[in-house]
């Protein structure tokens, strides 16, 4: 017995669309390319009508009784479907959680850089996890870290809303911000 090949070199089996001669049902409910019902016709006659018009007979609904077919240009139909799929894929944005890390003893410029990063993440539609991490005995100053996170939330209030207030989690203090759906209207002091 010859050894079995290590890799399956066969081409993947693609499910071919049910068009023209691949349709095996004897009776079909046929819809014209304009959307007009042609009624229940046998398969051979429906294929003749499609070929006379230079179009394809495409199985639309297999579960109906009798199955529904449509006379259309299959190449054009397939192109439109792929175009729609690309558009929906382009429009959909998966929200990710981006993290901005810092210590509670952060310098002004470093803080401004973290604010800039957070603004960029929020504008692209992602959530932001603001983390203040402690080393050694710094954990005793968790109130300063909470103050820093609240200041950050205040500085970012035009772009974001606080999803989770600052809370301690192990040796870190975290806060979650999400992009603001409606623009913030500032109250005028007068």
From Swiss-Prot:
Domain of life: Bacteria
Subcellular location: Cytoplasm
Chief site of localization: cytoplasm
Record GO terms (molecular function): ribosome binding; translation initiation factor activity
Cross-referenced InterPro entries: T_IF-3_C_sf (IPR036788), T_IF-3_N_sf (IPR036787), Translation_initiation_fac3_CS (IPR019813), Translation_initiation_fac_3 (IPR001288), Translation_initiation_fac_3_C (IPR019815), Translation_initiation_fac_3_N (IPR019814)
One GO cellular component term: cytosol
SUPFAM superfamilies according to UniProt: Translation initiation factor IF3, C-terminal domain (SSF55200), Translation initiation factor IF3, N-terminal domain (SSF54364)
Keywords recorded for this protein, A-Z: Cytoplasm, Initiation factor, Protein biosynthesis
Keyword Transmembrane: no
Pfam families per the UniProt record, alphabetical: IF3_C, IF3_N
Keyword Cytoplasm among record annotations: yes
GO BP annotations listed: ribosome disassembly
Function: IF-3 binds to the 30S ribosomal subunit and shifts the equilibrium between 70S ribosomes and their 50S and 30S subunits in favor of the free subunits, thus enhancing the availability of 30S subunits on which protein synthesis initiation begins.
Stored PANTHER family: TRANSLATION INITIATION FACTOR IF-3, TRANSLATION INITIATION FACTOR IF-3, MITOCHONDRIAL
Family, similarity comment: Belongs to the IF-3 family.
Subunit structure as annotated in this protein's UniProt entry: Monomer.
Listed name of the protein: Translation initiation factor IF-3
Source species of the chain: Prochlorococcus marinus subsp. pastoris (strain CCMP1986 / NIES-2087 / MED4)
Name of the coding gene: infC
